[in-house]
């Protein structure tokens, strides 16, 4: 027979004891820790990592031991463990070995609340919102109950609260491990009953019914149940102490929904045929109206005034991760929700659709392999109405993978049975990059799952706020502002991760404003043109990438032998215009793949000519967006480098040519083109990779080292020119870097030559934003 801890934990006739909690950082266990500390016990706890909750509890007296270790239970009187902790956990095993009494979280909670009039909220879905709402309403009625809810609820202050002066204790009862039967409720609320946690309930719904039935049998006063749920109705409708609620006018408490808004819902409540009044609930959704009706029935039973109930419900704001609005602007909204069961998902999507977004983009993280396996068919029908669905890998929650029960199985099931557009995201760390690059103004992003998927929403919200502020500041609909633009689209080598913020101005004014905006926020800026002579790492570019393109930046004008060109104009365009006006000296530009901006930045060259050989003056912006102009004599230029433009950004330049004739210009142009075609590959490349050493051209050195054709992954040393690395189609930046490093190492070891890269290598090798 199990020991009754009620008297000990409530300090009825006993002194405080030493208690250790295994898994103290979880939302459920942190609440138990808070209650035990309030009761005066000495409490320690361990977990894989600390959280904001553990930091808060430390201030209240918790001894947080950090990661699990056997010695943590030495000298303790009782160990409390969460349902996720099992044999094999070193603290659990040590406590067993020492014979220390051990109880589950639900047993501890039942003991703590045993001296109170307990109100237990049970059901497969909606427990946290309903218990939090009940606590809020009873507070409004000056009953000031103790409470225990399974998530952070800002309006309540904390997830668990002990009030020794109050008779009432409101708690959500967890059914996942059968521990619901530990409670002896005075009032039992049953929201719904469905198949879930089938890793524990091997006999499915039959076994689940038995647990809920026993829970209801132990209720000493009223049972409040939802008649809209067939299983709840089956378990409760014939009980003499049961009160029903729902949308049917035959229910004891029922309602008519008037309006669902983005953050609230209006409905009118009736008791039998009597109108009680109208309520504006501070959270949206039909399912939340049902949760509210359960609380109305409870408060009505406790004799509370309806006006007070309505006021508290209007003031209520939901728990964290329960249709939690992470971000809202005129362009986007991001909603985070804990829903991970098919029924919860359907209800949340229904609520989201009622807000009429232009597109509903859903991100779902399956929770546990066992649930995925047993509910695979139900998941396939849960996402109706979604315009785009992204599915991440399964959040294992400590489970081992099950063959055929992974995220790919859900994706395939959805594709076979629905027309929902679905995409599997295999890398969680870069999931927000994929989603952020997909969404557009007018979209609502709905984040669903019980694991860590909310992190995706938080990262999106962080960066969308910046891009929305930039749009407002620029007030220029022609300037493209996007998140996570894949840089492989903007480099001639066609590799590279995303740009955190991508800005594509077509006017100098917008370019200037963008620089000033990012400068004030201390966000680093890169300016990129056509992306030649550039290798961007796979982790992408943290900060902003500005791509001045089109508009004013593509303008080219001629005055005598002088050509003024914006930085977005291609070198090829300059040569063509020069030829039209019989201006010579630009023929070398014909085969250069870049544009004026990149040429200025790198002092690009060919056929014995460098860019600054022809530059008369440069107009540029500084990092704050101020415009300056300098003569080329005042700008230091070096081989493939112009230091002045490291932290300043060219917007245009004046070039000088010499008088010529079309025939001669055409001849020189063809010679330039022919030479480049014969000596350079046509496959995607960044141009010359290495600077030429003094002793030997880099291409010749690489050829002599027999490294033409050398490859790593999709990156290969060109067979045409040894100083070119080409992308065979699926190269990554790390492939290219590996080839570069192999060449450098061999040159140093075999020839004593230290090669320097001419190509600019920028960005992060790993994901950092």
Feature roles, as predicted:
Residues 483, 621-769:
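Phosphate/pyrophosphate- and phosphate-bearing ligand-binding catalytic cores of soluble enzymes
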Residues 46-47, 65-68, 103-110, 148-150, ...:
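Beta-strand->loop->alpha-helix junctions that form or flank phosphate-binding loops
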Residues 119-123, 572-616, 685:
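A gly/ser-rich beta-alpha-beta helix-loop segment of oxidoreductase catalytic cores
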Residues 380-441:
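C-terminal helical cap/extension that packs against the catalytic core
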Residues 496, 503-508, 535-554, 601-632, ...:
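Structural signature of FAD isoalloxazine-binding scaffolds in flavoprotein oxidoreductases
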Residues 11-16, 35-41, 58, 71-72, ...:
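Phosphate-binding loop of NTP-binding sites
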Residues 470-596:
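Anion-binding (especially nucleotide phosphate/pyrophosphate-binding) glycine-rich loop
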Residues 3-5, 10-20, 28, 35-39, ...:
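Nucleotide phosphate-binding/pyrophosphate-handling subdomain across enzymes
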């Amino acid at each position: 027979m199990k020991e009754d801890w009620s008297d000990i934990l409530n300090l009825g006739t006993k002194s405080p004891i030493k208690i250790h909690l295994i898994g103290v950082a979880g939302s459920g266990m942190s609440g138990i820790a808070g209650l035990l500390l309030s009761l005066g016990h000495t409490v320690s706890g361990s977990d894989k990592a600390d959280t904001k909750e553990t930091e808060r509890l430390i201030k209240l007296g918790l001894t947080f031991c950090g990661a699990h270790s056997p010695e943590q239970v030495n000298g303790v009187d009782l160990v409390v463990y969460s349902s996720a902790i099992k044999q094999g956990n070193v603290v659990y095993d040590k406590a067993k070995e020492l014979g220390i009494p051990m109880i589950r979280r639900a047993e501890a909670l039942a003991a703590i609340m045993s001296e109170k009039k307990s109100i237990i909220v049970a059901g497969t879905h909606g427990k946290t919102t309903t218990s939090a709402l009940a606590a809020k309403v009873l507070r409004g009625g000056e009953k000031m109950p103790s409470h225990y809810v399974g998530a952070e609820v800002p309006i309540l202050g904390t997830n668990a609260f002990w009030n020794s002066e109050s008779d009432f204790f409101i708690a959500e009862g967890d059914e996942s491990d059968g521990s619901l039967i530990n409670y002896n409720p005075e009032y039992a609320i049953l929201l719904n009953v469905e198949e879930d946690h089938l890793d524990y309930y091997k006999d499915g719904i039959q076994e689940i019914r038995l647990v809920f039935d026993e829970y209801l049998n132990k209720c000493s006063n009223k049972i409040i149940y939802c008649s809209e749920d067939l299983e709840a109705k089956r378990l409760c409708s014939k009980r003499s102490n049961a009160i029903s609620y729902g949308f049917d006018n035959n229910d004891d408490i029922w309602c008519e929904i008037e309006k669902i808004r983005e953050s609230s819902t209006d409905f009118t409540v009736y008791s039998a045929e009597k109108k009680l009044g109208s309520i504006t609930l501070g959270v949206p959704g039909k399912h939340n109206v049902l949760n509210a009706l359960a609380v109305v029935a409870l408060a009505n039973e406790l004799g509370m005034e309806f006006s007070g109930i309505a006021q508290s419900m209007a003031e209520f704001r939901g728990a964290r991760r329960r249709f939690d609005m992470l971000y809202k602007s005129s362009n986007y909204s991001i909603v985070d929700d804990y829903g991970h069961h098919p029924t919860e998902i359907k209800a949340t999507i229904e609520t989201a659709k009622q807000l009429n977004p232009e597109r509903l983009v859903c991100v779902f993280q399956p929770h546990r392999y066992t649930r995925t396996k047993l509910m695979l068919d139900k998941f396939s029908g849960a996402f109706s109405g979604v315009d785009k669905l992204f599915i991440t890998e399964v959040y294992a929650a400590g489970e081992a993978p099950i063959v055929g029960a992974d995220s790919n199985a859900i994706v395939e099931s959805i594709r076979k049975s629905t027309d929902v557009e679905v995409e599997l995201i295999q890398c969680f760390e870069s999931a927000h990059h994929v989603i952020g690059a997909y969404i557009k103004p007018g979209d609502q992003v709905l984040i669903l799952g019980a694991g860590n998927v909310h992190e995706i929403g938080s990262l999106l919200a962080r960066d969308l706020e910046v891009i929305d502020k930039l749009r407002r500041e620029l007030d220029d609909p022609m300037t493209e502002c996007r998140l996570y633009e894949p840089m492989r689209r903007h480099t001639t080598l066609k590799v590279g991760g995303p740009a955190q913020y991508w800005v594509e101005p077509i006017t100098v004014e917008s370019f200037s404003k963008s620089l000033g905006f990012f400068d004030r926020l201390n966000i680093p800026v890169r300016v990129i043109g056509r992306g030649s002579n550039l290798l961007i790492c796979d982790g992408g570019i943290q900060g902003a990438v500005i791509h001045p393109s089109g508009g004013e930046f593509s303008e080219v004008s001629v005055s005598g032998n002088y050509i003024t060109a914006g930085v977005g104009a291609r070198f090829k365009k300059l040569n063509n215009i020069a030829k039209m006006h019989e201006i010579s000296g630009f023929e070398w530009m014909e085969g250069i793949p870049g544009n004026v901006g990149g040429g200025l930045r790198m002092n690009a060259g060919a056929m014995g000519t460098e860019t600054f050989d022809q530059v008369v003056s440069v107009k540029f912006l500084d990092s704050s967006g101020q415009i300056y102009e300098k003569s080329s004599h005042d700008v230091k230029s070096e081989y493939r480098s112009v230091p002045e433009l490291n932290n300043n950004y060219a917007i245009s330049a004046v070039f000088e040519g010499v008088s010529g004739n079309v025939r001669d210009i055409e001849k020189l142009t063809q010679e330039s083109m022919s030479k480049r075609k014969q000596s350079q590959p046509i496959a995607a490349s960044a141009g010359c990779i290495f600077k030429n050493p003094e002793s030997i051209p880099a291409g010749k050195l690489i050829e002599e080292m027999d490294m033409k054709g050398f490859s790593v992954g999709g990156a290969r040393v060109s067979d045409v020119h040894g100083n070119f690395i080409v992308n065979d189609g699926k190269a990554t930046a790390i492939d290219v870097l590996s080839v570069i490093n192999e060449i450098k190492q061999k040159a140093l070891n075999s020839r004593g030559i230290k090669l320097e890269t001419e190509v600019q290598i920028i960005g992060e090798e790993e994901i950092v934003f």
